């Protein structure tokens, strides 16, 4: 009887311990699952809140810049545009001035008034930094142009000299021929001697043609040599100046 009683108590105690342990495991599992579910739920709510924050930041328009900065930018843009426009206008005006006094010098450089105006143009615009290089080249061009004009004038004068010599030689030759004809005619009136008439004609021919040639050939040779000297002198100067461009 006592043995059965002890066995019953031990079985009941064992069942009680078993049930208690199972109940603790169940609670632990439940709390673990609950904590796991809570952490998942918290993470999901946190990510949802962050997404909503990003969407609100993207949807909200950016704050406009202060009107002072915008006005300053507009003012600076206007000033730069005005400066560019003024520089372009100045450049166009200076280019027109350059073209004008280039034409003035090339076309009308013979007059003293035009030369004075050209010198004034050079004084006014030679100090411009933008056109210093151009002005240097232009001055070199003026030197070449002056040398070409001097060469043309010297050659023209030399040609006039040669033409004058030829004209004088031709005139004197014709005059000598006419004088010879008149002398032959006068001799034929006074005498019928053909030898005398032929002698007068030969003397007149010798004076008119070879005599004039001997007189004017040195002058023509001098003119030709002078032409060669002028051409060589100015050609060397022009070549040196052109090589400095």
From Swiss-Prot:
Please give the chief subcellular localization of this protein. Answer: host cell
Q: How does it sit in the membrane?
A: Multi-pass membrane protein
Membrane-crossing residue ranges in chain numbering: 165-185, 197-217
**Which keywords are on file for this protein?**
ATP-binding, Disulfide bond, Host cell membrane, Host membrane, Membrane, Nucleotide-binding, Signal, Transmembrane, Transmembrane helix
Its localization reads: Host cell membrane
Start and end residues of each stretch annotated as Disordered: 52-71
- Check the UniProt entry and state the signal peptide residues, or none: 1-25
One BP annotation, GO: cell-cell adhesion
The UniProt GO MF terms for this protein read:
ATP binding; nucleic acid binding
Q: How does it assemble?
A: Monomer. May form (via the first cytoplasmic domain) homodimers or homotrimers; disulfide-linked. Interacts with MAHRP1. May interact (via first cytoplasmic domain) with SBP1; the interaction is likely to occur at the ring stage in the Maurer's clefts and is weaken by ATP. Interacts (via extracellular domain) with human chemokine CX3CL1; the interaction mediates the adhesion of infected erythrocytes with endothelial cells.
The record's function comment reads:
During the asexual blood stage and probably at the ring/trophozoite stages, plays a role in Maurer's cleft formation and/or morphology. Also, involved in the loading of the virulence factor EMP1 into the Maurer's cleft membrane. By binding to host chemokine CX3CL1, mediates the cytoadherence of host erythrocytes infected with parasite mature forms (late trophozoite and schizont) to endothelial cells, which sequesters them away from the circulation and thus prevents their elimination by the host spleen.
> Could you identify this protein by its name?
CX3CL1-binding protein 2
Q: Which organism is it from?
A: Plasmodium falciparum (isolate 3D7)
């Amino acid at each position: 009887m006592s043995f059965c009683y002890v066995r019953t108590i031990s079985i009941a105690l064992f069942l009680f311990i078993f049930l208690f342990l199972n109940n603790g495991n169940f609670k632990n599992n439940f709390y673990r699952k609950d904590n796991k579910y809570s952490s998942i739920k918290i993470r999901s709510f946190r990510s949802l809140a962050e997404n909503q924050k990003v969407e609100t930041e993207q949807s909200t328009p950016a704050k406009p810049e202060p009107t002072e900065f915008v006005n300053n930018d507009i003012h600076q843009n206007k000033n730069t545009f005005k400066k560019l426009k003024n520089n372009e206008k100045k450049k166009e005006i200076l280019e027109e001035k350059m073209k004008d006094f280039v034409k003035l010098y090339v076309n009308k450089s013979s007059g003293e008034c035009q030369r004075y105006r050209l010198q004034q143009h050079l004084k006014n615009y030679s100090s411009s930094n933008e056109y210093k290089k151009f002005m240097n080249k232009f001055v070199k061009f003026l030197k070449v142009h002056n040398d070409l004009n001097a060469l043309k004038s010297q050659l023209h004068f030399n040609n006039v000299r040669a033409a004058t010599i030829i004209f004088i030689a031709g005139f004197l030759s014709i005059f000598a021929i006419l004088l010879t004809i008149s002398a032959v005619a006068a001799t034929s009136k006074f005498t019928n001697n053909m030898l005398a008439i032929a002698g007068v004609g030969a003397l007149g021919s010798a004076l008119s043609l070879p005599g004039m040639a001997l007189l004017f050939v040195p002058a023509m040779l001098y003119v030709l040599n002078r032409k060669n000297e002028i051409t060589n002198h100015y050609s060397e100067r022009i070549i040196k100046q052109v090589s400095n461009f």
